[in-house]
A protein has these predicted regions:
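Metallocarboxypeptidase
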Residues: 191-196, 202, 210-387, 394-396, ...
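Bacterial N-terminal signal peptides
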Residues: 6-15
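A short, amphipathic beta-strand motif
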Residues: 382-389, 415, 455, 462
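Alpha-helical segments with a strong preference for the paired helices of cellulosomal dockerin domains
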Residues: 465-486, 493-517
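Structured interaction patches on ligand/partner-binding surfaces of diverse proteins
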Residues: 433-460
Length: 518
């Protein structure tokens, strides 16, 4: 009987969806509710490449191709077809929502109205030729400044458009209130803010989770360790050529900048999901990152201002570790953190994937303070400029915290770095090819604005003759012994002027590796 009922539902969905599917040239996927008897079922579905989209502890919402329906039934899964993707029932532009053209006009109007604070750029085109718009908000939008970079991205899944509306409203909110609200003026003056309201414009127009090639973009980013096993800075494989166009554009853009904090918006639940989504373990098991405590704190800064989210009965405090909820492969947030050093979280805004337009004002009101508070988190931690002490030029550098395996990186063109940290005392190290590692110990981080520590890196050439040799060692010895006064700082390793500087210069001249944290 169950199989017959499922068959009838499928026939109904297919009949309604047939002409629609032909128009968009996308194979229809079924949205099924699967009874998860144990977590191994959830892991199996993920490993089969199906898009698990929600899990409440008993039932999972899963997107599957047509061919998988009978297969899962034959394997003993209890499931119910609850919809199709694309959906024939949802209007392309329900009342209250912006379609792609209207969104484009909205962004262009903002850029024209606030030319001193904004720049609107295209990151590239989608499969069907639509622009992926990014609006840059800054007090100096044409200048790369010594300040942290932040981004909001929405609607990587085209059937989850409420985040697009919130991104538009948030951009407008910042710009309209810049001249009258000191708090907003502060974040616009001190942060380079980027907003991509619609990452999957084709999917949004077609009312589908996927892009126009039928690919789930949030299951298609390079995955660790299958696609890369080290950071981009250390030569990690970008693995971009085989990616979907929308992913290629986001990856290139992310690596052209130096983002410290990010979030991407979804719907279908109400929770802030923080990394890791996948560390090789099973669903339902915590996969903590090296910055787990920091991430929980940042996630809470969003959730606590959204009362419904914060009071969730499923997710205590409105936050969850990604893998503890359910594992995904190829997600954007893990790629950002593991590959570029940018902390990114996935924020689920509403339990309904495509709420009626009448809900939009309420959802915006519930999330406005959360969006601003989350953005303000990027101003915390430790920051500074890293430069060549002989030339003053910026140095692209890896920044490490003792006891934490996840580095961040400085901006290659500006030289600024920003390391998000909780209040406490930390030992930092700064390393770059061709330079002596530099350490700064006992850095105090307060509950407020970031502590500043600028870092002058040395290649060991302290007499500035273009090479590192015995003459540099001899000069260092004479300065340390007080024989030869010198008006420049030759503390090349950050440990104070002493024998370690001599040893560092010797090692540098002989190309001997120098310990970062002895």
């Amino acid at each position: 009987v169950k199989k017959f009922l499922i068959f009838l539902l499928v026939v109904i969905f297919l009949t309604i969806n047939e002409s629609f599917a032909q128009k968009v040239s996308l194979p229809v996927w079924y949205i099924v509710q699967v009874n998860i008897k144990n977590l191994s079922d959830l892991n199996y579905l993920e490993k089969q490449g199906y898009s698990v989209d929600f899990f409440d502890g008993k039932y999972a919402r899963v997107y599957i191709p047509e061919t998988a329906l009978e297969k899962l039934q034959s394997e003993g899964f209890e499931l119910q077809v609850i919809g199709t993707d694309p959906s024939p029932y949802i209007e392309k532009t329900p009342s209250g929502y912006h379609n792609y053209a209207e969104m484009t006009q909205f962004l262009q109007d903002l850029a024209n109205t606030y030319p001193n604070l904004t720049r609107l750029i295209s990151l590239g085109q989608s499969v069907q030729g639509r622009e992926l718009w990014a609006i840059h908000i800054s007090d100096n939008p044409d200048v790369e400044e010594d300040e942290p970079e932040f981004k909001y991205i929405s609607t990587i899944h085209g059937d989850e458009p409420i985040g697009t509306e919130l991104c538009l409203f948030f951009a407008e909110y910042l710009l309209q209130n810049y001249s009258t609200d000191a708090r907003i003026k502060n974040v616009v003056d001190e942060v380079s803010i980027w907003i991509v309201p619609l990452m999957n414009p084709d999917g949004r127009e077609l009312v589908t989770r996927r892009n126009a090639n039928g690919v789930d973009l949030n299951r298609s980013f390079p995955d660790y360790p299958t696609d890369f096993n080290t950071f981009y800075y250390d030569g990690g494989n970008l693995s971009i050529e085989t990616r979907e166009p929308e992913i290629q554009h986001i990856m290139r853009w992310s690596l052209e900048h130096n983002f410290s904090l990010s979030a991407n918006f979804h719907t279908g639940a109400m929770v802030v999901n923080y990394p890791y989504d996948n560390d090789g373990g099973p669903s339902g098991v915590e996969a903590p990152s090296p910055d787990d405590a920091l991430m929980k704190w940042i996630a809470t800064q969003y959730a606590i201002h959204n009362i419904s989210m914060y009071n969730s009965t499923q997710f205590p405090g409105g936050i969850t570790n990604g893998a503890a909820w359910y594992v995904i492969t190829g997600g954007m947030q893990d790629w950002n953190y593991r590959f570029t050093g940018c902390i990114e979280m996935t924020i689920e805004l509403f339990n309904t994937k495509f709420p009626a337009g009448s809900w939009i004002p309420t959802i915006w009101n519930d999330n406005r303070e959360s969006m601003l508070s989350y953005l303000e988190c990027v101003l915390r931690g430790v920051r500074g400029l890293i430069y060549d002490r002989n030339t003053g030029e910026p140095v692209w550098t890896k920044v490490l915290v003792q006891g934490n395996t996840q580095p961040v990186f400085s901006h290659p063109r500006v030289g600024n770095y920003h390391r998000l940290l909780l209040p406490g005392t930390y030992n930092l190290a700064f390393t770059a090819p061709g330079y002596i590692p530099y350490r700064v110990n006992g850095v105090g981080v307060i509950d407020g604005w970031a502590t500043r520590r600028d870092v002058p890196l040395s290649d060991g050439d302290i007499n500035v003759d273009g090479k590192v040799d015995d003459e540099d060692v001899e000069l260092a010895v004479r300065v340390i012994l007080g024989i030869t006064p010198i008006d420049k700082d030759i503390d090349v390793d950050g440990n104070g002027l002493g024998a370690s500087d001599i040893q560092a210069i010797i090692n540098q001249s002989l190309s001997i590796p120098i310990a970062i944290f002895p």
